[in-house]
UniProtKB/Swiss-Prot annotation:
<comment type="similarity">
    <text>Belongs to the thaumatin family.</text>
</comment>
<comment type="function">
    <text>Basic thaumatin-like protein. Does not exhibit beta-1,3-glucanase activity with laminarin as substrate.</text>
</comment>
<keyword id="KW-0611">Plant defense</keyword>
<comment type="subunit">
    <text>Monomer.</text>
</comment>
<keyword id="KW-0020">Allergen</keyword>
<protein>
    <recommendedName>
        <fullName>Thaumatin-like protein 2</fullName>
    </recommendedName>
</protein>
<dbReference type="GO" id="GO:0006952">
    <property type="term" value="P:defense response"/>
</dbReference>
<keyword id="KW-1015">Disulfide bond</keyword>
<keyword id="KW-0568">Pathogenesis-related protein</keyword>
Length: 9
C-alpha cells in the first residue's frame, strides 16, 4: 500500500 503524506497547518 502507498500513502500520501500531507501536512495541513
Amino acid at each position: 500500500a502507498t500513502f500520501d503524506i500531507q501536512n495541513n497547518c
